[in-house]
Protein backbone atom coordinates (compact mmCIF):
# COMPACT_ATOMS: atom_id res chain seq x y z
CA UNK A 1 0.00 0.00 0.00
CA UNK A 2 2.90 2.36 0.67
CA UNK A 3 4.14 1.61 -2.85
CA UNK A 4 0.77 2.59 -4.31
CA UNK A 5 0.59 5.68 -2.14
CA UNK A 6 3.92 6.90 -3.49
CA UNK A 7 2.70 6.68 -7.07
CA UNK A 8 -0.58 8.42 -6.32
CA UNK A 9 1.21 11.36 -4.71
CA UNK A 10 2.31 12.26 -8.24
CA UNK A 11 -1.22 12.04 -9.59
CA UNK A 12 -3.71 14.23 -7.72
CA UNK A 13 -6.70 13.29 -9.86
CA UNK A 14 -7.72 10.47 -7.51
CA UNK A 15 -8.05 12.99 -4.65
CA UNK A 16 -10.85 14.66 -6.63
CA UNK A 17 -12.56 11.27 -7.01
CA UNK A 18 -11.59 10.95 -10.67
CA UNK A 19 -10.79 7.26 -10.85
CA UNK A 20 -11.25 6.98 -14.59
CA UNK A 21 -7.94 8.72 -15.31
CA UNK A 22 -6.05 6.09 -13.33
CA UNK A 23 -6.99 3.39 -15.80
CA UNK A 24 -4.71 5.11 -18.33
CA UNK A 25 -1.69 4.93 -16.01
CA UNK A 26 0.84 2.22 -16.78
CA UNK A 27 1.85 1.46 -13.18
CA UNK A 28 -1.73 0.47 -12.30
CA UNK A 29 -1.49 -2.69 -14.38
CA UNK A 30 1.88 -3.56 -12.95
CA UNK A 31 0.57 -3.21 -9.41
CA UNK A 32 -2.61 -5.10 -10.30
CA UNK A 33 -0.55 -8.13 -11.30
CA UNK A 34 1.81 -7.77 -8.32
CA UNK A 35 -0.56 -8.26 -5.37
CA UNK A 36 2.27 -7.93 -2.89
CA UNK A 37 3.30 -4.48 -4.20
CA UNK A 38 6.85 -5.64 -4.79
CA UNK A 39 9.25 -3.08 -6.25
CA UNK A 40 11.14 -5.71 -8.19
CA UNK A 41 8.24 -6.23 -10.58
CA UNK A 42 9.39 -3.29 -12.67
CA UNK A 43 12.84 -4.85 -12.98
CA UNK A 44 11.76 -8.45 -13.50
CA UNK A 45 8.98 -7.59 -15.96
CA UNK A 46 10.51 -5.11 -18.31
CA UNK A 47 7.77 -5.69 -20.87
CA UNK A 48 4.99 -4.11 -18.82
CA UNK A 49 5.60 -0.61 -20.13
CA UNK A 50 5.27 -1.97 -23.66
CA UNK A 51 2.23 -4.15 -23.01
CA UNK A 52 0.31 -1.54 -21.01
CA UNK A 53 1.28 1.79 -22.52
CA UNK A 54 -1.05 4.79 -22.54
CA UNK A 55 -1.96 4.39 -26.20
CA UNK A 56 -2.57 0.63 -25.97
CA UNK A 57 -4.87 0.97 -22.95
CA UNK A 58 -6.79 3.80 -24.58
CA UNK A 59 -7.11 1.80 -27.79
CA UNK A 60 -8.37 -1.23 -25.86
CA UNK A 61 -11.10 0.81 -24.18
CA UNK A 62 -12.20 2.21 -27.54
CA UNK A 63 -12.34 -1.25 -29.09
CA UNK A 64 -14.29 -2.60 -26.12
CA UNK A 65 -17.03 -0.02 -26.61
CA UNK A 66 -17.06 -0.65 -30.37
CA UNK A 67 -17.40 -4.38 -29.79
CA UNK A 68 -20.14 -3.71 -27.26
CA UNK A 69 -22.11 -1.99 -30.03
CA UNK A 70 -21.79 -5.16 -32.08
CA UNK A 71 -23.11 -7.19 -29.16
CA UNK A 72 -26.23 -5.08 -28.86
CA UNK A 73 -26.94 -5.31 -32.59
CA UNK A 74 -26.17 -8.99 -33.10
CA UNK A 75 -28.80 -11.68 -32.64
CA UNK A 76 -26.63 -14.77 -32.90
CA UNK A 77 -24.10 -15.02 -30.07
CA UNK A 78 -22.17 -17.68 -31.99
CA UNK A 79 -21.23 -15.07 -34.61
CA UNK A 80 -20.04 -12.60 -32.02
CA UNK A 81 -16.32 -12.05 -32.46
CA UNK A 82 -16.00 -10.34 -29.09
CA UNK A 83 -15.87 -13.69 -27.37
CA UNK A 84 -13.09 -14.92 -29.58
CA UNK A 85 -9.66 -15.50 -28.17
CA UNK A 86 -8.25 -12.21 -29.46
CA UNK A 87 -11.20 -10.01 -28.58
CA UNK A 88 -11.50 -11.55 -25.13
CA UNK A 89 -8.10 -10.09 -24.24
CA UNK A 90 -9.51 -6.54 -24.28
CA UNK A 91 -11.99 -7.28 -21.55
CA UNK A 92 -9.56 -9.29 -19.44
CA UNK A 93 -6.76 -6.70 -19.47
CA UNK A 94 -8.93 -3.69 -18.67
CA UNK A 95 -11.11 -5.46 -16.10
CA UNK A 96 -8.08 -6.55 -14.07
CA UNK A 97 -6.82 -2.98 -13.94
CA UNK A 98 -10.28 -1.62 -13.16
CA UNK A 99 -10.76 -4.12 -10.33
CA UNK A 100 -7.56 -2.79 -8.76
CA UNK A 101 -8.53 0.86 -9.27
CA UNK A 102 -11.92 0.71 -7.55
CA UNK A 103 -10.23 -0.56 -4.39
CA UNK A 104 -7.89 2.45 -4.18
CA UNK A 105 -10.21 5.02 -2.48
CA UNK A 106 -11.24 2.58 0.24
CA UNK A 107 -7.71 1.35 0.92
CA UNK A 108 -6.20 4.84 1.04
CA UNK A 109 -8.96 6.31 3.20
CA UNK A 110 -8.46 3.46 5.63
CA UNK A 111 -4.71 4.11 5.59
CA UNK A 112 -5.18 7.83 6.21
CA UNK A 113 -7.68 7.20 9.02
CA UNK A 114 -5.16 5.02 10.84
CA UNK A 115 -2.34 7.58 10.67
CA UNK A 116 -1.19 8.76 14.06
CA UNK A 117 -3.22 6.12 15.87
CA UNK A 118 -1.52 3.48 17.95
CA UNK A 119 -3.25 0.38 16.63
CA UNK A 120 -1.66 -2.98 17.18
CA UNK A 121 -1.19 -4.72 13.85
CA UNK A 122 -1.77 -8.39 14.43
CA UNK A 123 -2.35 -11.03 11.82
CA UNK A 124 -4.26 -13.00 14.45
CA UNK A 125 -7.15 -10.54 14.16
CA UNK A 126 -7.65 -11.71 10.57
CA UNK A 127 -8.09 -15.34 11.55
CA UNK A 128 -11.55 -16.75 10.90
CA UNK A 129 -11.16 -18.93 14.00
CA UNK A 130 -11.00 -15.85 16.21
CA UNK A 131 -14.80 -15.75 15.93
CA UNK A 132 -15.31 -19.05 17.79
CA UNK A 133 -14.11 -17.80 21.22
CA UNK A 134 -16.65 -14.99 20.78
CA UNK A 135 -19.39 -17.54 20.01
CA UNK A 136 -18.41 -19.62 23.03
CA UNK A 137 -18.66 -16.58 25.27
CA UNK A 138 -21.91 -15.09 23.91
CA UNK A 139 -24.05 -17.78 22.29
CA UNK A 140 -24.11 -20.07 25.32
CA UNK A 141 -26.39 -17.54 27.09
CA UNK A 142 -28.81 -16.98 24.19
CA UNK A 143 -32.02 -18.75 23.20
CA UNK A 144 -32.81 -18.31 19.51
CA UNK A 145 -30.86 -17.71 16.34
CA UNK A 146 -31.75 -16.58 12.82
CA UNK A 147 -29.88 -18.63 10.23
CA UNK A 148 -29.67 -16.23 7.27
CA UNK A 149 -28.53 -16.67 3.67
CA UNK A 150 -27.82 -13.17 2.34
CA UNK A 151 -29.54 -12.84 -1.06
CA UNK A 152 -27.71 -11.73 -4.19
CA UNK A 153 -28.93 -8.60 -5.95
CA UNK A 154 -31.26 -9.56 -8.79
CA UNK A 155 -30.62 -6.43 -10.85
CA UNK A 156 -27.09 -5.43 -11.78
CA UNK A 157 -27.92 -1.75 -11.40
CA UNK A 158 -28.17 -2.30 -7.63
CA UNK A 159 -24.42 -2.99 -7.56
CA UNK A 160 -23.70 0.17 -9.55
CA UNK A 161 -25.86 2.26 -7.25
CA UNK A 162 -24.02 0.87 -4.23
CA UNK A 163 -20.66 1.99 -5.65
CA UNK A 164 -22.24 5.36 -6.48
CA UNK A 165 -22.51 6.07 -2.76
CA UNK A 166 -18.74 5.82 -2.47
CA UNK A 167 -17.45 7.67 -5.53
CA UNK A 168 -18.47 10.70 -7.60
CA UNK A 169 -16.71 9.69 -10.81
CA UNK A 170 -19.47 9.07 -13.36
CA UNK A 171 -17.02 7.77 -15.97
CA UNK A 172 -15.93 4.96 -13.67
CA UNK A 173 -19.56 4.02 -13.08
CA UNK A 174 -20.17 3.85 -16.85
CA UNK A 175 -17.19 1.54 -17.25
CA UNK A 176 -18.42 -0.60 -14.36
CA UNK A 177 -21.81 -0.90 -16.08
CA UNK A 178 -20.05 -2.08 -19.20
CA UNK A 179 -18.22 -4.86 -17.36
CA UNK A 180 -21.42 -6.01 -15.69
CA UNK A 181 -23.67 -5.91 -18.73
CA UNK A 182 -21.35 -7.29 -21.41
CA UNK A 183 -21.98 -10.90 -20.34
CA UNK A 184 -25.71 -10.34 -19.96
CA UNK A 185 -25.84 -8.85 -23.45
CA UNK A 186 -23.92 -11.83 -24.76
CA UNK A 187 -26.64 -14.20 -23.62
CA UNK A 188 -29.71 -12.72 -21.97
CA UNK A 189 -31.22 -16.16 -21.41
CA UNK A 190 -28.90 -17.09 -18.55
CA UNK A 191 -30.23 -16.66 -15.03
CA UNK A 192 -28.75 -14.29 -12.47
CA UNK A 193 -27.31 -17.26 -10.56
CA UNK A 194 -25.56 -18.53 -13.70
CA UNK A 195 -24.28 -15.06 -14.49
CA UNK A 196 -22.86 -14.56 -10.98
CA UNK A 197 -21.04 -17.88 -11.28
CA UNK A 198 -19.71 -16.90 -14.72
CA UNK A 199 -18.64 -13.41 -13.64
CA UNK A 200 -16.99 -14.57 -10.39
CA UNK A 201 -14.83 -17.07 -12.30
CA UNK A 202 -13.96 -14.53 -14.98
CA UNK A 203 -12.87 -11.70 -12.70
CA UNK A 204 -12.81 -12.88 -9.10
CA UNK A 205 -11.22 -9.74 -7.68
CA UNK A 206 -13.85 -7.39 -9.11
CA UNK A 207 -16.67 -9.75 -8.13
CA UNK A 208 -15.48 -9.98 -4.51
CA UNK A 209 -15.20 -6.20 -4.32
CA UNK A 210 -18.74 -5.69 -5.63
CA UNK A 211 -20.19 -8.39 -3.41
CA UNK A 212 -18.44 -7.05 -0.30
CA UNK A 213 -19.69 -3.55 -1.16
CA UNK A 214 -23.22 -4.92 -1.40
CA UNK A 215 -22.91 -6.69 1.96
CA UNK A 216 -21.29 -3.64 3.57
CA UNK A 217 -24.19 -1.46 2.42
CA UNK A 218 -26.67 -3.94 3.86
CA UNK A 219 -24.83 -4.29 7.17
CA UNK A 220 -24.23 -0.57 7.68
CA UNK A 221 -27.97 0.12 7.48
CA UNK A 222 -29.10 -3.02 9.27
CA UNK A 223 -26.77 -2.52 12.24
CA UNK A 224 -27.71 1.15 12.44
CA UNK A 225 -31.41 0.27 12.54
CA UNK A 226 -30.75 -2.42 15.11
CA UNK A 227 -28.83 -0.03 17.37
CA UNK A 228 -31.61 2.57 17.34
CA UNK A 229 -34.33 0.60 19.13
CA UNK A 230 -31.93 -1.24 21.40
CA UNK A 231 -30.23 1.96 22.62
CA UNK A 232 -26.81 0.34 22.25
CA UNK A 233 -25.19 2.94 20.02
CA UNK A 234 -21.83 1.80 18.77
CA UNK A 235 -18.84 4.10 18.50
CA UNK A 236 -17.89 4.48 14.86
CA UNK A 237 -14.35 3.34 14.21
CA UNK A 238 -11.97 4.84 11.67
CA UNK A 239 -12.16 1.59 9.75
CA UNK A 240 -15.74 2.39 8.69
CA UNK A 241 -15.28 4.59 5.65
CA UNK A 242 -17.35 7.66 4.94
CA UNK A 243 -19.86 7.61 2.11
CA UNK A 244 -21.58 10.47 0.29
CA UNK A 245 -24.21 12.05 2.54
CA UNK A 246 -23.89 9.13 4.97
CA UNK A 247 -24.13 11.28 8.08
CA UNK A 248 -26.98 13.27 6.53
CA UNK A 249 -28.81 9.99 5.96
CA UNK A 250 -28.17 9.01 9.59
CA UNK A 251 -29.56 12.30 10.90
CA UNK A 252 -32.61 11.92 8.68
CA UNK A 253 -33.17 8.37 9.91
CA UNK A 254 -32.94 9.51 13.53
CA UNK A 255 -35.60 12.16 12.89
CA UNK A 256 -37.83 9.62 11.19
CA UNK A 257 -37.43 7.19 14.08
CA UNK A 258 -38.21 9.89 16.63
CA UNK A 259 -41.37 11.07 14.89
CA UNK A 260 -42.88 8.01 13.28
CA UNK A 261 -41.31 4.65 14.07
CA UNK A 262 -40.14 4.89 17.66
CA UNK A 263 -43.22 3.12 19.01
CA UNK A 264 -43.18 0.47 16.29
CA UNK A 265 -39.49 -0.32 16.64
CA UNK A 266 -39.81 -0.55 20.40
CA UNK A 267 -41.12 -4.07 19.84
CA UNK A 268 -37.72 -4.99 18.38
CA UNK A 269 -35.87 -3.85 21.47
CA UNK A 270 -33.34 -6.48 22.54
CA UNK A 271 -30.14 -5.69 24.43
CA UNK A 272 -28.82 -9.25 24.04
CA UNK A 273 -28.60 -9.54 20.28
CA UNK A 274 -25.42 -10.50 18.43
CA UNK A 275 -24.66 -10.56 14.72
CA UNK A 276 -22.06 -12.82 13.07
CA UNK A 277 -21.31 -13.25 9.36
CA UNK A 278 -18.86 -15.13 7.17
CA UNK A 279 -19.14 -14.80 3.39
CA UNK A 280 -22.82 -15.10 2.41
CA UNK A 281 -24.05 -16.67 5.64
CA UNK A 282 -24.93 -14.79 8.81
CA UNK A 283 -26.51 -15.40 12.20
CA UNK A 284 -28.55 -13.12 14.44
CA UNK A 285 -28.74 -14.61 17.93
CA UNK A 286 -30.96 -13.28 20.68
CA UNK A 287 -32.07 -13.97 24.22
CA UNK A 288 -35.60 -12.93 23.32
CA UNK A 289 -38.67 -14.97 22.53
CA UNK A 290 -39.63 -16.74 19.32
CA UNK A 291 -42.16 -13.98 18.58
CA UNK A 292 -39.36 -11.41 18.53
CA UNK A 293 -37.34 -13.54 16.10
CA UNK A 294 -40.36 -13.92 13.81
CA UNK A 295 -40.68 -10.13 13.71
CA UNK A 296 -37.00 -9.76 12.84
CA UNK A 297 -37.33 -12.40 10.13
CA UNK A 298 -40.09 -10.61 8.25
CA UNK A 299 -38.48 -7.26 8.92
CA UNK A 300 -35.32 -8.46 7.11
CA UNK A 301 -37.35 -9.83 4.19
CA UNK A 302 -39.14 -6.49 3.77
CA UNK A 303 -35.89 -4.59 4.25
CA UNK A 304 -34.19 -6.44 1.38
CA UNK A 305 -37.21 -6.06 -0.88
CA UNK A 306 -37.79 -2.35 -0.24
CA UNK A 307 -34.23 -1.07 -0.09
CA UNK A 308 -32.32 -3.41 -2.42
CA UNK A 309 -35.20 -4.53 -4.66
CA UNK A 310 -34.24 -8.10 -3.84
CA UNK A 311 -36.93 -10.74 -3.63
CA UNK A 312 -35.89 -12.78 -0.62
CA UNK A 313 -37.98 -15.81 0.17
CA UNK A 314 -38.75 -16.35 3.87
CA UNK A 315 -37.29 -19.86 3.66
CA UNK A 316 -33.83 -18.29 3.31
CA UNK A 317 -34.15 -17.31 6.98
CA UNK A 318 -34.61 -20.08 9.54
CA UNK A 319 -35.55 -19.58 13.18
CA UNK A 320 -33.88 -22.17 15.38
CA UNK A 321 -33.59 -22.76 19.09
CA UNK A 322 -29.96 -23.06 20.12
CA UNK A 323 -30.64 -25.76 22.69
CA UNK A 324 -31.94 -28.30 20.15
CA UNK A 325 -30.44 -27.26 16.83
CA UNK A 326 -26.93 -27.28 15.37
CA UNK A 327 -25.51 -24.43 13.30
CA UNK A 328 -23.59 -25.30 10.15
CA UNK A 329 -20.92 -22.61 10.17
CA UNK A 330 -17.43 -22.62 8.62
CA UNK A 331 -17.27 -26.41 8.45
CA UNK A 332 -18.35 -26.97 12.08
CA UNK A 333 -21.63 -28.11 13.60
CA UNK A 334 -22.14 -25.81 16.58
CA UNK A 335 -24.79 -26.06 19.27
CA UNK A 336 -25.51 -25.07 22.86
CA UNK A 337 -25.53 -28.10 25.15
CA UNK A 338 -26.54 -28.35 28.80
CA UNK A 339 -23.56 -29.74 30.67
CA UNK A 340 -24.60 -31.11 34.11
CA UNK A 341 -22.16 -31.12 37.01
CA UNK A 342 -22.38 -32.22 40.64
CA UNK A 343 -20.89 -30.02 43.37
CA UNK A 344 -20.42 -31.22 46.97
CA UNK A 345 -20.43 -28.52 49.65
CA UNK A 346 -19.18 -29.21 53.21
CA UNK A 347 -20.56 -26.98 55.96
CA UNK A 348 -19.34 -27.90 59.45
CA UNK A 349 -20.58 -31.44 60.06
CA UNK A 350 -23.07 -31.53 57.20
CA UNK A 351 -22.46 -31.89 53.50
CA UNK A 352 -24.72 -31.01 50.60
CA UNK A 353 -24.75 -32.20 47.02
CA UNK A 354 -25.90 -29.61 44.48
CA UNK A 355 -26.71 -30.42 40.88
CA UNK A 356 -25.56 -27.61 38.65
CA UNK A 357 -26.05 -27.30 34.89
CA UNK A 358 -24.00 -25.00 32.68
CA UNK A 359 -24.64 -24.19 29.03
CA UNK A 360 -21.60 -24.87 26.88
CA UNK A 361 -21.06 -24.06 23.21
CA UNK A 362 -20.00 -27.23 21.41
CA UNK A 363 -18.27 -27.34 18.03
CA UNK A 364 -18.29 -30.72 16.32
CA UNK A 365 -16.90 -32.17 13.11
CA UNK A 366 -19.76 -33.01 10.69
CA UNK A 367 -19.00 -36.65 9.88
CA UNK A 368 -21.43 -37.25 7.00
CA UNK A 369 -20.55 -34.05 5.07
CA UNK A 370 -16.85 -34.76 5.64
CA UNK A 371 -17.21 -38.26 4.18
CA UNK A 372 -19.04 -36.68 1.25
CA UNK A 373 -16.11 -34.30 0.67
CA UNK A 374 -13.63 -37.18 0.88
CA UNK A 375 -15.72 -39.24 -1.54
CA UNK A 376 -15.84 -36.31 -3.97
CA UNK A 377 -12.03 -36.08 -3.89
CA UNK A 378 -11.74 -39.88 -4.37
CA UNK A 379 -10.23 -40.69 -0.97
CA UNK A 380 -13.11 -43.03 -0.09
CA UNK A 381 -16.48 -44.17 -1.38
CA UNK A 382 -19.83 -42.78 -0.28
CA UNK A 383 -19.90 -45.21 2.66
CA UNK A 384 -16.56 -44.00 4.02
CA UNK A 385 -14.45 -46.99 2.96
CA UNK A 386 -10.95 -45.83 1.90
CA UNK A 387 -9.95 -46.30 -1.74
CA UNK A 388 -6.78 -45.63 -3.69
CA UNK A 389 -6.20 -42.36 -5.52
CA UNK A 390 -5.01 -43.35 -9.02
CA UNK A 391 -4.14 -39.81 -10.16
CA UNK A 392 -1.31 -39.70 -7.59
CA UNK A 393 0.03 -43.17 -8.39
CA UNK A 394 2.62 -41.75 -10.81
CA UNK A 395 4.30 -39.69 -8.08
CA UNK A 396 7.23 -40.87 -6.01
CA UNK A 397 6.58 -42.69 -2.74
CA UNK A 398 7.78 -39.77 -0.64
CA UNK A 399 5.56 -37.30 -2.53
CA UNK A 400 2.50 -39.51 -2.11
CA UNK A 401 3.08 -39.92 1.63
CA UNK A 402 3.82 -36.21 2.00
CA UNK A 403 0.59 -35.18 0.25
CA UNK A 404 -1.61 -37.43 2.35
CA UNK A 405 0.25 -36.40 5.51
CA UNK A 406 -0.13 -32.68 4.78
CA UNK A 407 -3.87 -33.07 4.20
CA UNK A 408 -4.24 -34.98 7.48
CA UNK A 409 -2.21 -32.47 9.50
CA UNK A 410 -3.99 -29.47 7.98
CA UNK A 411 -7.42 -30.95 8.78
CA UNK A 412 -6.39 -31.69 12.36
CA UNK A 413 -5.05 -28.16 12.58
CA UNK A 414 -8.32 -26.69 11.25
CA UNK A 415 -10.52 -28.81 13.55
CA UNK A 416 -8.32 -28.41 16.62
CA UNK A 417 -11.14 -26.53 18.36
CA UNK A 418 -13.57 -29.42 18.05
CA UNK A 419 -15.26 -30.52 21.27
CA UNK A 420 -14.89 -34.19 20.39
CA UNK A 421 -11.59 -35.21 18.87
CA UNK A 422 -12.56 -38.85 18.36
CA UNK A 423 -14.34 -38.08 15.09
CA UNK A 424 -11.05 -36.79 13.69
CA UNK A 425 -9.47 -40.21 13.98
CA UNK A 426 -11.87 -41.54 11.34
CA UNK A 427 -10.46 -38.88 9.01
CA UNK A 428 -6.94 -39.99 9.86
CA UNK A 429 -7.93 -43.63 9.24
CA UNK A 430 -9.39 -42.83 5.79
CA UNK A 431 -6.33 -40.87 4.70
CA UNK A 432 -3.86 -43.43 6.07
CA UNK A 433 -5.50 -46.43 4.39
CA UNK A 434 -6.10 -44.46 1.17
CA UNK A 435 -2.40 -43.59 1.12
CA UNK A 436 -1.43 -47.22 1.70
CA UNK A 437 -3.75 -48.41 -1.07
CA UNK A 438 -2.37 -45.81 -3.46
CA UNK A 439 1.19 -46.99 -2.76
CA UNK A 440 0.15 -50.64 -3.05
CA UNK A 441 -1.54 -49.90 -6.36
CA UNK A 442 1.61 -48.23 -7.63
CA UNK A 443 3.89 -51.15 -6.66
CA UNK A 444 1.25 -53.79 -7.50
CA UNK A 445 1.27 -55.17 -3.98
CA UNK A 446 -1.16 -55.69 -1.10
CA UNK A 447 -1.90 -53.13 1.59
CA UNK A 448 -0.86 -55.45 4.42
CA UNK A 449 2.51 -56.15 2.83
CA UNK A 450 3.15 -52.49 2.24
CA UNK A 451 2.24 -51.46 5.80
CA UNK A 452 4.64 -54.08 7.20
CA UNK A 453 7.43 -52.80 5.00
CA UNK A 454 6.92 -49.13 5.89
CA UNK A 455 6.28 -49.62 9.61
CA UNK A 456 6.29 -46.70 12.03
CA UNK A 457 7.87 -44.26 9.56
CA UNK A 458 4.67 -44.35 7.53
CA UNK A 459 2.53 -43.57 10.61
CA UNK A 460 4.71 -40.62 11.64
CA UNK A 461 3.55 -38.65 8.60
CA UNK A 462 0.02 -38.59 10.01
CA UNK A 463 0.83 -37.05 13.39
CA UNK A 464 0.11 -33.40 13.99
CA UNK A 465 3.04 -31.10 14.61
CA UNK A 466 1.90 -30.35 18.17
CA UNK A 467 1.70 -34.08 18.88
CA UNK A 468 5.33 -34.44 17.84
CA UNK A 469 6.38 -31.58 20.10
CA UNK A 470 4.43 -32.90 23.10
CA UNK A 471 5.82 -36.39 22.65
CA UNK A 472 9.29 -34.94 23.21
CA UNK A 473 8.24 -32.98 26.32
CA UNK A 474 5.59 -35.11 28.02
CA UNK A 475 4.99 -38.85 28.18
CA UNK A 476 2.08 -40.01 26.05
CA UNK A 477 0.28 -41.42 29.10
CA UNK A 478 0.75 -38.38 31.33
CA UNK A 479 -2.33 -36.58 32.66
CA UNK A 480 -1.25 -33.18 31.28
CA UNK A 481 -0.65 -34.61 27.83
CA UNK A 482 -4.03 -36.36 27.77
CA UNK A 483 -5.81 -33.16 28.79
CA UNK A 484 -4.03 -31.32 26.00
CA UNK A 485 -5.09 -33.86 23.39
CA UNK A 486 -8.71 -33.70 24.56
CA UNK A 487 -8.79 -29.93 24.96
CA UNK A 488 -10.03 -27.39 22.46
CA UNK A 489 -7.43 -25.20 20.81
CA UNK A 490 -8.24 -22.37 18.38
CA UNK A 491 -5.28 -21.50 16.18
CA UNK A 492 -5.24 -17.90 14.99
CA UNK A 493 -3.27 -18.51 11.80
CA UNK A 494 -6.21 -19.81 9.73
CA UNK A 495 -7.57 -17.28 7.24
CA UNK A 496 -9.95 -19.36 5.09
CA UNK A 497 -12.07 -22.49 5.24
CA UNK A 498 -10.27 -25.71 4.46
CA UNK A 499 -11.27 -27.03 1.04
CA UNK A 500 -12.41 -30.38 2.46
CA UNK A 501 -14.30 -28.61 5.26
CA UNK A 502 -16.29 -26.43 2.85
CA UNK A 503 -19.41 -28.53 2.29
CA UNK A 504 -21.48 -25.94 0.39
Curated annotation (Swiss-Prot):
This protein's GO CC annotations: chloroplast
Alphabetically ordered keywords of this record: Chloroplast, mRNA processing, Plastid, RNA-binding, tRNA processing
Compartment(s): Plastid, Chloroplast
Keyword Transport set for record: no
GO BP annotations, alphabetical order: mRNA processing; RNA splicing; tRNA processing
Pfam families the record matches: Intron_maturas2 (PF01348), MatK_N (PF01824)
MF GO annotations: RNA binding
Chief location of this protein within or outside the cell: plastid
Similarity section: Belongs to the intron maturase 2 family. MatK subfamily.
Role description: Usually encoded in the trnK tRNA gene intron. Probably assists in splicing its own and other chloroplast group II introns.
Protein name per the record: Maturase K
Amino acid sequence: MEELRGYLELDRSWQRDFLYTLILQEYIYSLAHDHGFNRTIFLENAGYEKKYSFLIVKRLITRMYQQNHLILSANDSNQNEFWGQKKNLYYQVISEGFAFIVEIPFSLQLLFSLEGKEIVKSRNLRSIHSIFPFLEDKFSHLNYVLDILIPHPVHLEILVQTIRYWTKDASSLHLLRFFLYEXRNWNSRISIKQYISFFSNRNQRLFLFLYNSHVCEYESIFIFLRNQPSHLRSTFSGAFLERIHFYEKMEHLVKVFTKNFQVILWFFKDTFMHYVRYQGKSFVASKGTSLLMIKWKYYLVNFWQCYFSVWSQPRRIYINQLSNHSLDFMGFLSSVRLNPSVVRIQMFEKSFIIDNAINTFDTLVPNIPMIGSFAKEKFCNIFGHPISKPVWADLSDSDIIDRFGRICRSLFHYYSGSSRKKSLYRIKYILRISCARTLARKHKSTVRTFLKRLGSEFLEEFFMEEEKVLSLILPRDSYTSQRFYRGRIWYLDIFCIHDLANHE
